[in-house]
C-alpha cells in the first residue's frame, strides 16, 4: 500500500531568498503567516486592502506588523467595497453585533459581518501583486467567513 504525504507548505533553505506575498489584514492569522514566511527566509511583500471597513484599526495593525517584520514592501490598496453593501463592516446602516461569545452557537445563516466575496476579491488582488513582484508564494490567513 502506498502512502502519500501532502506538504501544505514548503519552506526554502534560509540562504535562498525567495519572495512571498502575504495578504496582511492586521489580524492574528495573517500576521502569523507573514512571520512564518519571514522566519523561513522569504523576502516578504505585504498587501493590505482598505476596502472601506469600519475598523480602521485593522489598517494600523497591518502597518505595525509590516514594520515589525521589516517586510520588503507594504502596499495598502484602496478598493472601496461600500457600494456593494450587504455587510455591517461596510454599511453604516447595518449594526455590528456586539458581545458575542466564542462558545455561543453560530447561526445557520451568513452573519451580517460577511462582506460578499471579500476573500475572493482580496485573493485576486494578491495574485496580481504576487505576479508583479515575481513572488514564489502567496500567503493568506483566514479564520472565518
Where are these regions (language model features)?
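ATP-dependent adenylation/nucleotidyltransferase module used to activate substrates
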Residues: 9-145
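N-terminal amphipathic/basic-hydrophobic helices that include classical n-h-c signal peptides
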Residues: 1-9
